[in-house]
């Protein structure tokens, strides 16, 4: 499915569902609810695989690809990329209302544009890389099996922000929470030149940690680091500081 030209205005319908192996968004999509479900097989409307289909054609590089001039604008947006190893790319704008945004990808999630919601945002992928802007006016959750790469990027939520991955790379990046910032990395966190900020507090659990960036919280900062720890930047807590 390719959206081009004047785009797709489904704002007068209750819901817009796009189901295909790959979806290219080169123009705007407007609706109250948008579901984009991609992959090879038979799926129910929740995006679950209910039957397989044989194919000998090569996999696309991106199963959901929003170009710089493309965008999705809806009260609720749900993107599900089911094909193994095939990811989701956004170079445009994906903007949801109070009902929020969820993205689930069985590959890489690459954000080069703007991802925003008046409600909550949940992003889950094998790997998450952002060089653009991610902002939720509600809670924000990022979950990756491999690395979350937030270098030179700004990722924020007005509510709790939860970040979980094998490794978190926040060099020259910003991870900001209007409430509690919780980070868990099984292997390593790099915050060289970066900023971790939690209004209510900041929690960090990892095996090793490095960087000269800032850790700031108006409440408590609590860090559990099982192995190597090298930090040369500021660490300021309005409450307890527990290492």
Which residues does each PLM region occupy?
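Extracellular and secretory-pathway beta-repeat/beta-biased strand scaffolds
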Residues: 1-243
């Amino acid at each position: 499915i390719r959206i081009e030209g004047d785009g797709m205005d489904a704002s007068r319908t209750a819901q817009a569902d796009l189901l295909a192996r790959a979806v290219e968004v080169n123009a705007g999509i407007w609706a109250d609810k948008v579901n984009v479900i991609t992959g090879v097989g038979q799926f129910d409307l929740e995006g679950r695989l209910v039957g397989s289909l044989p194919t000998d054609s090569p996999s696309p590089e991106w199963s959901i690809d929003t170009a710089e001039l493309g965008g999705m604008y809806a009260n609720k947006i749900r993107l599900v990329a089911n094909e193994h190893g095939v990811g989701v790319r956004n170079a445009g704008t994906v903007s949801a209302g109070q009902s929020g945004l969820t993205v689930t990808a069985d590959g890489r999630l690459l954000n080069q544009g703007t991802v925003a919601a008046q409600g909550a945002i949940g992003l889950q992928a094998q790997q998450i890389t952002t060089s653009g802007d991610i902002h939720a006016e509600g809670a924000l959750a990022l979950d990756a099996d491999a690395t979350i790469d937030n270098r030179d990027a700004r990722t924020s939520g007005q509510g709790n922000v939860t970040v979980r991955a094998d490794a978190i790379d926040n060099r020259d990046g910003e991870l900001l929470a209007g409430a509690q910032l919780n980070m868990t990395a099984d292997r390593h966190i790099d915050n060289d030149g970066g900023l971790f900020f939690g209004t209510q507090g900041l929690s960090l659990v990892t095996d090793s940690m490095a960087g000269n960036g800032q850790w700031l919280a108006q409440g408590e900062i609590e860090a559990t680091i099982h192995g190597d720890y090298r930090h040369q930047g500021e660490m300021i807590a309005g409450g307890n500081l527990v290492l």
